[in-house]
Structures are given as C-alpha cells and as structure tokens.
C-alpha cells in the first residue's frame, strides 16, 4: 500500500515541520527504491528531513522497507544476535571503538553480527580498518552469514547488502551533511539482530533512535550519546543512555568514574591517520594497548554484554571485558574470523 500524497505534498509537509505517518514514510522509501524521486527532489527531501528531525516512526518505517528488499542467500542463524553499529558522523576522529567492541564482546560469548560501512566523517570507518587488517569483505554472502554460527562474529558490509542505495551515495556526498540515511544505517542490519548498542552523534537522536528500535521489535538495546559529543560511551564524563527493554524506554547515565577509573579527555582517543588507527585497534584486541584505549572499549563492551543478556551488572561486564582483553582473546577471535572468510 502506498500513500496517495504526491512527492511535492510530502515535501511540503516536511518543510512545514509536520511528521510523516508510517504509511507515508514507507511510501517515500519505496519511491526512492523504485527511482520515482529525482536527484533534485532527493536533495530537498534529505534537507527537509534533517531540518525537521526524524521521528521513531519515520525511521522504523523507512528501515523496514529497506529490509524488505534485502534478501538473505541462506537462512538467518537461529541465534541471539547483537550489533554494535552506530550512526557515525561525530567528527571526533577517534580510533574505531565500535569495531574493537565487537571483537571484545564476541570473545566474551556474544554472537555479533556487525553492520558497517566505510568512513562517514572519521579517519576510518569499520569497513576501512577491517579491510586494511586483511579481512575479506568480498567473500560469498553465504560465508558472511555462516561465520556468526561458526566463529561467533561476522561483518556485513552495508553496500553489498543494500545495493539499491548505492545510486544515492554521490548525491549524499555532494550535500555534505548528515542525512536520514546516516540514521537508517544502524537500523538495517540484514540479519535483524535481537539486540544492539547504537551510538549517536547528536543528543537529539537518543529518543527517536530508541523509539525506532522499540518499534522494530528489538529485545534489548542501548542508544548512547557520549560525553563531549562522541557516538560511543566516552571516558571524559557523563554519557547519556536510552535503554530499550521489556517494550519500554528508560533514560540513564553512565560515567567511567562509576567503575573506579579516572575520567580521560576524548583527545586521548584521537587518531591522526589510518595506520595509527589500525595499530591502536590491534593493540587493544591483543591486550597491549594504552589504558585509555582499553578502558573505553571495555566500557562500551559492558553495554553490549548487558544488551546480550550476558551481564546485567555493568561493573561485572566491564571487568569481564577487561579480563578478555588482557588475555588477548579478542585478537584471537579476529584471526579466527579472518581465516574463516579466506578459506574456500
């Protein structure tokens, strides 16, 4: 079913600050997928949605339409899957924390299906760093899916699964602003995870993203806005959280000082180039990294362990993540995934 509103009527509603209902939101995404919206109209729609701010209904409805056209080559594993994909776009140029978190959580027993892409605004996105470390993201889609059952973690490179959106990439790059598609990225993991920790680059996205996850049936999730504007939980100070659990949203806060560790400025997490990002990621995973790098990964990993239902006590989750890192288990998990994806 499609909305009877024309493109210009939908655009006018957005420009007047009116929220779109579920039917109209789905119809808008269908029109993008069916090439029924021109480049000029697309630019106007994306700018209008950005100016208005997207709602949970708009985000969940558009995400569902994208997922409906994303077909899996083999059956989804019957596992409790967790994603650590966030919006990106905080512009802070930190090392790739969420990617490190994925391997730490996997080494603690979480089944990770990480959705990701190349960099939006940072030095390197999750796909960039994994490719540079030798992970084969061009292997068969079947192998990508079976990896989560065999190894306990997999990585889904967004452009491979959402080919219909590739045509919008040049226009989005030309616009040069964060758009609704940055917000949709974490919501359209083809394996439809049961739980998620989702970092946002803007505080006003906390509730809409939480409501979108709730509407999409997420069992447990945490949306996090980090102190100092990070799209991860930060060591700098108080981090704001929206927790999705038992069909409800609740708001919370977390600070590394709660774990008897000192606050550290976000500048300590910044990387200058691609090579240093890879070095830091590897050093965290093998347990040889700086304490600030290890602590920020352990803090975010504790959130993932909560979402996975493995550790309800965040202090216990933090300590569990630290222990795994100190043992070098996350790096072993990375090597297992690398070898698995390379074999025929």
Swiss-Prot record:
Residues engaged in binding Mg(2+) 1: 98, 232
Please give the catalytic activity noted in the UniProt record: N-(5-phospho-beta-D-ribosyl)anthranilate + diphosphate = 5-phospho-alpha-D-ribose 1-diphosphate + anthranilate
> Which domain of life does this protein belong to?
Bacteria
Positions bound to 5-phospho-alpha-D-ribose 1-diphosphate: 86, 89-90, 94, 96-99, 114-122, 126
What Pfam families does UniProt report for this protein, alphabetically?
Answer: Glycos_trans_3N, Glycos_transf_3
Q: Does the keyword Amino-acid biosynthesis feature in the UniProt annotation?
A: yes
Gene Ontology biological process terms from the UniProt entry:
L-tryptophan biosynthetic process
Extract the coiled-coil ranges from the record.
none
Name the keywords, alphabetized: Amino-acid biosynthesis, Aromatic amino acid biosynthesis, Glycosyltransferase, Magnesium, Metal-binding, Transferase, Tryptophan biosynthesis
What are the names of the required cofactors?
A: Mg(2+)
Q: Name one GO molecular function term.
A: anthranilate phosphoribosyltransferase activity
Q: Which residues bind anthranilate 2?
A: 172
EC supergroup of this enzyme: transferase
Instruction: Detail which positions bind anthranilate 1.
Output: 86, 117
Q: Which residues bind Mg(2+) 2?
A: 231-232
A GO cellular component annotated for this chain's UniProt record is:
cytosol
InterPro entries noted in UniProt: Anthranilate_Pribosyl_Tfrase, Glycosyl_Trfase_fam3, Glycosyl_Trfase_fam3_N_dom, Glycosyl_Trfase_fam3_N_dom_sf, Nuc_phospho_transferase
Q: Write out the pathway annotation from the protein's UniProt entry.
A: Amino-acid biosynthesis; L-tryptophan biosynthesis; L-tryptophan from chorismate: step 2/5
Q: How does it assemble?
A: Homodimer.
Please identify the protein, giving its name as recorded: Anthranilate phosphoribosyltransferase
What gene does this protein come from? trpD
